[in-house]
Amino acid sequence: MVSPRKGKRIRMLKKNDIIQVAISDLSHEGAGVAKHDGFVFFVDNALPEEVIDMRVLKVNKNSGFGKVEAYHYLSPARNADVNLTYLRTGIADLGHLTYEDQLTFKKKQVQDSLYKIAGISDVTVESTIGMTEPLAYRNKAQVPVRRVNGQLETGFFRKHSHDLIPISDYYIQDKEIDRLINFTRDLLRRFDIKPYDETEQTGLLRNIVVRRGHYSGEMMLVLVTTRPKVFRVDQVIEKIVEAFPAVVSIIQNINDKNTNAIFGKDFKTLYGKDTITDSMLGNNYAISAQSFYQVNTVMAEKLYQTAIAFSDLSKDDIVIDAYSGIGTIGLSFAKTVKAVYGVEVIEAAVRDAQHNAALNGITNAYFVADTAEHAMATWAKDGIKPSVILVDPPRKGLTESFIQASVAMGPQKITYVSCNPATMARDIKRYQELGYKLAKVQPVDLFPQTHHVECVVLLIKE
């Protein structure tokens, strides 16, 4: 719909007004975009080409939010089979879009960010690498526990709230993880365990966290409680392990703070090991409750394989792995290069990376706890000259000081693994100003059914 002609009197929209609109696009977060009388509205569960009756939820200066009251025309790209609960909680905020169209949407997000932020339109963005089976892929679940209708429930919070929606089938989580969560929920109900109450700051059980090795099948169960004393723990452990022999680790975490953080500082192993083990690209990894480990093992392997292919490595190459975590990317590179130098600010992750290198008999990978900027300056003084710098930053992207420090080392290539197209495009623009040219762009779908997209890009020194 077009903006009104100059001078035309406009009735200002207010909350709960219902208007008919056409959806013209999707936002970068997967919401439908509708334009009406100069306003842009964002509408959940609405797709391009759809015509809807929209209830106004909120109006800002030039934009607003609405929700679907009725559909007049449905997009042929709509997946009609998805449970709306997954949209309401954000578990699968793109689940109403067919998977083929999800992949197209994610490619477009990368293209749009590169053009709008970095002014780049002359580099091909490849089609998004997708999953053959894009459901039940998550190897980790973090599930809040609350009282709903008088009983302990597990599920997810409604979007933009702390109202728990009970769920038994989490759609994108490994089905064995779902089974363990539901079994634990039912078991703790029988023991009359009190769920956490955020408002009153009472109750014992806050969260259930489960990890499962994609290849090993090993499972870890973490019970997050508000105090150290636990409930008939021997009986609970016995019943869980009897029903799930693959559970090799049961851990208690104590979080007594009024916070949205999942974990507190204190962990206690109640049963079995402190870690589970899984493999990725032929390397084995010890994974603790807190370890950062990609939640989609199959697609993480494709992501890392893409980064390795883009880097075009040889036995004479030296690679710097910034943001090295527990070593998963760097150790994947180590087999094909002279040496890998990894840096990570979290000391526990560095210890895990060192342990994982030893676990796999890898002797040419070195990990330090430091800021990347300081570590790179130290390595430069020691005469280390990387041919490739690999970066895998958090969503906020790279700092100016990091970019300057990486350029100062003079690598021929920078391989950038991104989880945020906008900050990636910003950083690419800066690298191009400093003498690097964007050569390759490959989106990878690590998070099917959601709006999130990972991307691997290659920058080459001009």
UniProtKB/Swiss-Prot annotation:
Keyword hit for Hydrolase: no
Highest taxon in the source lineage: Bacteria
Enzyme nomenclature, EC number: 2.1.1.-
Molecular function as annotated in GO: rRNA (uridine-C5-)-methyltransferase activity
The protein's enzyme class: transferase
Stored InterPro entries: MeTrfase_TrmA_AS, MeTrfase_TrmA_CS, NA-bd_OB-fold, SAM-dependent_MTases_sf, TRAM_dom, U5_MeTrfase_fam
Residues the record marks as active site: C419 (nucleophile)
GO biological process: rRNA base methylation
Any one Pfam family match given in the protein's UniProt record, by short name: tRNA_U5-meth_tr
Disulfide links within the chain: none
Domain TRAM residue range list: 12-70
Residues engaged in binding S-adenosyl-L-methionine: Q294, Y323, E344, D392
Keywords: Methyltransferase, S-adenosyl-L-methionine, Transferase
PROSITE patterns in alphabetical order: SAM_MT_RNA_M5U, TRAM, TRMA_1, TRMA_2
NCBIfam families: rumA
Protein family membership: Belongs to the class I-like SAM-binding methyltransferase superfamily. RNA M5U methyltransferase family.
Name of the protein in question: Uncharacterized RNA methyltransferase SpyM3_1024
Provenance organism: Streptococcus pyogenes serotype M3 (strain ATCC BAA-595 / MGAS315)
Upper taxonomic lineage: Bacteria, Bacillati, Bacillota, Bacilli, Lactobacillales
